[in-house]
Design a protein with these regions (language model features):
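Membrane-interface aromatic/basic loop that binds lipid-linked glycans or pyrophosphate carriers
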Residues: 252-309
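Catalytic core of nucleotide-sugar-dependent glycosyltransferases
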Residues: 189-198, 202-228, 240-269
Length: 309
């Protein structure tokens, strides 16, 4: 069972971490396995049971007592040498009372029958120093701070609205915390190991419309003081927009694209104009499924995505 590998990968430094396992009325062995670990490691593992309609991120944060927070799905795991480096780094920052909002690491895909692939940020972030947004080099196209690469200060994560659908915890965690992240540190180790590709379902197209609107209205992008910060946010929104429109095209909902554009343009004309100037901007008025399909192929390769019915 993949869950064993995920939990075991957290226990090497069990005296310095808390492992919160959230079970939302699973119908398999999840709860039983989780309870066994809680019994074996009562000082480290805590099992939380909740209803299916309660966002797991919200309930986990309510129970979290750690200074920093990381999300790990049951089919992923943590690289062991990297775990030691991460804990030692955080311990050092706590010792010197440094204010660190976000720790970023590399991550890798370890998918059966496929070549291992590491994603590195060494050409983007300064190394061996705390830095802020203005210290970051220019972002490459398709660059994203991935959920698997982040360890966020718990108090920072608690500032955002965690009532969104569970399927969007990735976007909520990474995008939602941007206004509150001032200080960062990059650790050049492949900490998070993805054991599978991330899937995007065409049947969820309307949910992605809601996500796009939610992210768009979440905060005022132009209130962000750093130009690098604003640039990153617009690039992030561009990616979500392209995926949303592609799903609407594939599900034959072109009228929803027009309604989405009206919403975005009306609620933030300046941001909408900036979005249209991006690499994907020429697509916004075209609704050309073939062109969107080409971009999705790029995303699938860069982000290891799978588009499914």
């Amino acid at each position: 069972m993949e869950m064993h590998k995920a939990i075991n990968s957290c226990l090497l430094m069990k005296d310095e971490v808390e492992v919160l396992i959230v079970d939302r009325h699973s119908h398999d062995e999840t709860l039983q396995v989780a309870k066994e670990y809680e019994e074996a490691y009562p000082e480290t593992v805590k099992v939380i049971t909740t209803r299916e309609d309660v966002p797991f991120l919200k309930i986990a944060l309510e129970h979290s007592e750690g200074l920093y927070f990381k999300i790990l799905q049951c089919f992923d795991y943590l690289d062991q040498p990297s775990l030691v480096s991460v804990i030692e780094t955080i311990r050092d920052f706590i010792r010197i009372q440094a204010n660190l909002d976000l720790l970023v690491t590399d991550y890798k895909y370890v998918i059966p029958q496929e070549k291992e692939k590491r994603v590195s940020y060494k050409n983007v972030f300064p190394m061996e120093t705390i830095f802020e947004w203005h210290n970051i080099k220019a972002f490459h196209k398709h660059f994203q701070i991935d959920l698997g690469s982040v360890i966020i200060k718990t108090s920072t994560l608690k500032k955002i609205n965690t009532d969104e659908e569970n399927i969007f915890y990735n976007e909520l965690t990474v995008y939602g915390t941007i206004p509150y992240i001032k200080s960062m540190y990059y650790l050049n180790v492949p900490f998070h190991c993805y054991g599978t590709r991330r899937k995007i379902h065409i049947s969820k197209s309307n949910s992605y419309v809601d996500l796009m609107k939610s992210l768009w209205d979440l905060y005022d992008v132009y209130s962000l003081k750093s130009r690098r910060q604003r640039s990153y946010v617009i690039e992030y929104l561009s990616k979500v927009y392209v995926i949303t429109v592609y799903l609407l095209l594939k599900s034959n909902q072109k009228e929803q694209i027009e309604l989405l554009n009206v919403h975005l343009g009306f609620n933030d004309p300046k941001l909408y104009k900036a979005l249209t100037k991006r690499v994907y901007g020429f697509l916004i008025s075209s609704s050309n499924e073939k062109l969107y399909g080409m971009l999705i192929k790029v995303f699938e390769k860069v982000y290891q995505l799978e588009i499914e019915e």
